[in-house]
Amino acid sequence: MSNRSYTQEELADILKGMGVTDQTDVSRYGSGHINDTFKVETKRGVRFILQRINTDIFPDAEMLKDTVMRVTGHLRAKGVPSLEVIAYANPWRLYAFLDGYTSRDVVSEPRQAYDVARAFAKFQNDLADMPPPRLGEIIPKFHDTPDRMRQLDEAVKVNYKGRLANVAKEMAFVEAWRRNTSRLSDLMAAGKIPERITHNDTKINNVLVAADGTAVVIDLDTVMPGSALSDFGDMVRTSSAAAAEDEKDLSKVYSKIEYFEQLAKGYLEGAKFLNDCEKDNLVFSGKLATFEVGIRFLADYLKGDTYFHTAYEDHNLVRARTQFKMVESIEAQEAEYEAIVKKYRG
């Protein structure tokens, strides 16, 4: 979340420009780290979400607006519950508040893994028939793992405060894995894995659920063309993890097979559009997505912690080690994971 503070008067002026003048309370909302988000209460009893887009992360505000408006419009036209944009005044936007929905920050039981996988599979499926033009790439090369490797190689040259001396084991792991990093991009270039519209941030807290089980996928700022496998891989990384992303005790870090099974079951039940090559690479995508985030943390550590917020000196290194341990855990269970995919792939 941005450290920027706003007075009630400033927020009132912004809301006035969007047609809201009867607010009774405007307060910080949610646990996001990128945009500034506020919940707006009004005298009418109507609630809104007011959000300021972080233009450092999303410099092309018009492309972002076009993406969000097209995605939400397409979903709502099909009768699919979605965010409703009330007004835009870049870099600010106003959403209708989704009453009756709740979210979770942690997957605490296997059924929740199933639900999140079904929700994102349905999201991809619902956007599969979006008409041209092609959506813009909000963050170019976001899941281009070879390019992330290039960035790590550059970070090694920076070697902030001689930190490279602390990561010999991690760098050896990276080098052993380097040959795998272009696998999915090569398959896409060869036309074996198609480009699809993907979410690119498939954490459980980006799925809101109503009492009747209706799910709404939120945080649409990274929706853009990509591989469906990037979305599934990140679900494996986040929703099958036994420990937090920055757990220091690596003995607690592993991928839970019962959670992976529910992810695979839910995703394959909902993602009937997947071709055989995509299904063949579902387990690999979990490893690759986790490795990719690991090298991003490692690169940031070697550059002096310039991108990810850190709470202490070696925070990014701890995060990188956790991701690499997750990769090893998935590899250790790979035969079992592949058997699970075979069980549900149809």
Predicted regions: what is each one?
Residues 205-244:
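Catalytic activation segment of kinase domains across protein kinase-like and atypical kinase folds
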Residues 2, 27-31, 51, 55-62, ...:
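ATP-dependent phospho-/nucleotidyl transfer catalytic cores
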Residues 1-24:
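Juxta-kinase regulatory segment immediately upstream of eukaryotic protein kinase catalytic domains
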Residues 16-23, 76-81, 271-272:
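Short secondary-structure junctions
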Residues 229-273, 288-307:
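Active-site activation/catalytic loop segments of kinase-like enzymes and analogous catalytic loops
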Residues 21-42:
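ATP-binding glycine-rich phosphate-binding loop
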Residues 43-135:
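ATP-binding pocket architecture of kinase catalytic cores
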